[in-house]
Amino acid sequence: MKLSELLDSQLIFTELESLEKELFLRKIISRISDVQSSIKESTVIDLILKREKLCSTGLDNFIAIPHAKIPGIDKTYISLCISNNGIDFGSIDGLKTKILILILNPEETGNHHLEILKSVSSLFTKKNVINQMLNIKNPEDIINFIKANE
């Protein structure tokens, strides 16, 4: 499974301001629900924040992958967000998150989310990919860049 096949340019947000983690997540989820009417903002916020309280999804190399299984949706939605100044996500390396990949899966997906997480992590273990992506501002260009590097 390729990340580029799951991305929608309407759910890619660049040049985002640096905010506190919960406020940032609320803002992104609000934007997603504006674009996708099947996304119930309050439900998604509750589930994502509950997941973050269990264990931060901040990884290393400026990446965070918040994710949850969402009732009432029938397909996976992925939002890719870039904040060049970063957000403190409690990442394992102590660095601020600059690239956030928010994954919303239907409840009945089995291990589908694990395939997506594997695809995301294999792409973003390449430091040059991260550095180059931080300079791309156009959502379609981001999708094309990801396709070229998968």
Residue locations for each model-derived region?
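Cytosolic covalent-transfer regions centered on His/Cys nucleophiles
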Residues: 1-150
